[in-house]
């Protein structure tokens, strides 16, 4: 399918993105399932792939997932790479058969990313604003908690704050924290 690109063959991904642009795509987002499990640091190979893909005129944004923890957000020439969005639709809670006491607390962290994409008078399309909302997975209920948006009463506030601090400490300065007011 045209929305699915090949597994980390950088030149093939770039070729597929170029094909998408020739076919009418105005903004290409590359989704990569990658990263060392439970590592908040991006690897040298991830950084190399990010640099190669974002140097292409056909790749506009990278969103990574797979490490089960938050990984940094990089901004290169007004293009973004979210190396890892953490856990949102999955978690490592364990169960009666497979306890997960070895899973780091950071596997409960995730984020919702937001990118404002604008078209300029010259026809150029790019990200003009970007932000995130940190999330936390309650291992007892499997509930996704958007931090600062909707926090249940049955959750320890200290757990939420630790998650929020871990997330902001990893992603860096290139993505601003979105704040919602009631």
Give, region by region, the residue ranges found by the protein language model.
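Acidic, metal/ion-coordinating pockets
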Residues: 1-182
């Amino acid at each position: 399918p045209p929305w699915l690109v090949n597994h980390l063959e950088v030149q093939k991904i770039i070729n597929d993105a170029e094909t998408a642009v020739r076919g009418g795509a105005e903004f290409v987002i590359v989704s990569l399932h990658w990263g060392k499990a439970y590592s908040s640091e991006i690897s040298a190979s991830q950084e190399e792939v990010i640099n190669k893909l974002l140097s292409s005129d056909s790749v506009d944004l990278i969103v990574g997932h797979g490490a089960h923890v938050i990984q940094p957000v990089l901004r290169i020439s007004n293009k973004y790479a979210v190396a890892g969005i953490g856990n949102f639709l999955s978690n490592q809670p364990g169960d009666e058969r497979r306890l997960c006491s070895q899973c780091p607390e950071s596997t409960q962290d995730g984020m919702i990313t937001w990118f404002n994409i604008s078209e300029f008078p010259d026809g150029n399309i790019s990200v003009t604003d970007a932000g995130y909302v940190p999330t936390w997975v309650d291992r007892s209920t499997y509930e996704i908690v958007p931090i600062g948006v909707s926090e249940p009463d049955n959750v320890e506030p200290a757990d939420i704050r630790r998650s929020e601090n871990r997330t902001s400490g990893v992603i860096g300065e290139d993505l601003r924290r979105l704040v919602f007011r009631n």
